[in-house]
From Swiss-Prot:
Record's protein name: Protoheme IX farnesyltransferase
Annotated metabolic or biological route of this protein: Porphyrin-containing compound metabolism; heme O biosynthesis; heme O from protoheme: step 1/1
Protein family membership: Belongs to the UbiA prenyltransferase family. Protoheme IX farnesyltransferase subfamily.
Keyword NADP among record annotations: no
Keywords: Cell membrane, Heme biosynthesis, Membrane, Transferase, Transmembrane, Transmembrane helix
Source organism (scientific name): Mycobacteroides abscessus (strain ATCC 19977 / DSM 44196 / CCUG 20993 / CIP 104536 / JCM 13569 / NCTC 13031 / TMC 1543 / L948) (Mycobacterium abscessus)
GO BP: heme O biosynthetic process
GO MF entry, a single one: protoheme IX farnesyltransferase activity
Cellular-component GO terms for this entry: plasma membrane
Domain of life: Bacteria
Bilayer-crossing regions: 23-43, 56-76, 107-127, 128-148, 155-175, 182-202, 243-263, 291-311
Length: 313
């Protein structure tokens, strides 16, 4: 959910009045398309935490706090990455790369969003969810962006942990604790992130090379990259099946069928590279979004329907 995340808002505002262009630039800083992952995973996590019997107001408040936290992390990421965003074609139209927003104002905006996220979640949910939001922002900015991203090809493996946190925040907002289903959901997204991101990086590896970012497709052969994509895809699917122990039959069936489909795409990509055939990594990137959405939507439906879990059958 990363491609073209900032170009849409700014593109629509090119002929807008200056005030509106400024608003759109600040919206673009938050990378709205990246925030979609929050919506796709947080609601199902909250529904599973209480088997569908969750106060709708709590869901809305948690989503608002989560959106502010994600927007804060993404904005501060833009501040830290402004130099390489100017080099990469895919990110050259981001607000700081185009000087649509000053670095100082972007930094203030990101910090205010982060403080607001913590305060809102503490006030409307509980302290644990607020602290998890702060930890997510800090990890994404200081560990992933400032340390891992420019130093190791495993950047998205460990840095991807930040994208797993919305399920933890959602679960803790309902239960005020962290239990094993939340950890399994964390694992699903953790293992899903590398194949999702590496598929995109295969398409834009020259961009990353020019910016000096050692993404795996930049420093490794296509065969090695697609092999690791396949390994992490298997780990993703196995994690979704493990989650079936806490969910019901609807989720189990959908997770299995979606997993077969996702694995087929990953195997096809790996096989294509080994046979020297033309490959379409961007297709896997796009379809991985659909896969995650299908699995978590099935989890939400299962939780609301309230059919017996596999433990109860």
């Amino acid at each position: 959910m990363r491609m073209r995340e900032t170009q849409g808002a700014q593109g629509r505002g090119r002929n807008a009045p200056p005030f509106l262009r400024t608003i759109l630039a600040y919206i673009a800083l938050t990378k709205p398309r990246v925030i979609e992952l929050l919506l796709v995973t947080t609601i199902p996590a909250m529904l599973l935490a209480d088997r569908g019997d969750v106060n709708p107001l709590l869901i809305l408040n948690t989503l608002l706090g989560g959106v502010m936290a994600a927007a804060s992390a993404n904005t501060l990421n833009c501040v830290a990455d402004a130099d390489i965003d100017k080099v990469m074609k895919r990110t050259a139209r981001r607000p700081l790369a185009m000087s649509s927003v000053t670095t100082r104002n972007a930094l203030i905006f990101g910090v205010v969003l982060g403080v607001g996220a913590f305060a809102w979640l503490w006030w409307t949910a509980n302290l644990l969810s607020g602290l998890l939001a702060v930890a997510t922002i800090a990890f994404y900015v200081f560990v992933y962006t400032l340390v891992l991203k420019r130093r190791t090809a495993q950047n998205v493996v460990w840095g991807g942990a930040a994208g797993c946190m919305p399920v933890m925040i959602g679960w803790s907002a309902v239960t005020n604790t962290i239990q094993w289903p939340a950890l399994v959901m964390f694992a699903v997204i953790f293992f899903w992130t590398p194949p999702h991101t590496w598929a995109l990086a295969m398409r834009y590896k020259e961009d990353y090379r020019a910016a000096g970012v050692p993404m795996l497709p930049v420093i490794a052969t296509e065969e090695k990259v697609t092999k690791l994509i396949l390994v992490y895809t298997w780990l993703t699917v196995l994690s979704t099946l493990a989650l079936a122990l806490a969910a019901g039959v609807i989720y189990a069936v959908v997770a299995f069928l979606a997993g077969v489909w996702f694995l087929a795409m990953a195997h096809q990509l790996y096989s294509g590279v080994r046979k020297g055939q033309p490959i379409r990594p961007l297709r896997l990137f796009l379809q991985s979004n659909n896969y995650l959405a299908v699995v978590f939507c099935a989890l939400a439906v299962d939780s609301v329907v309230g059919w017996p879990t596999l433990f109860q059958l």
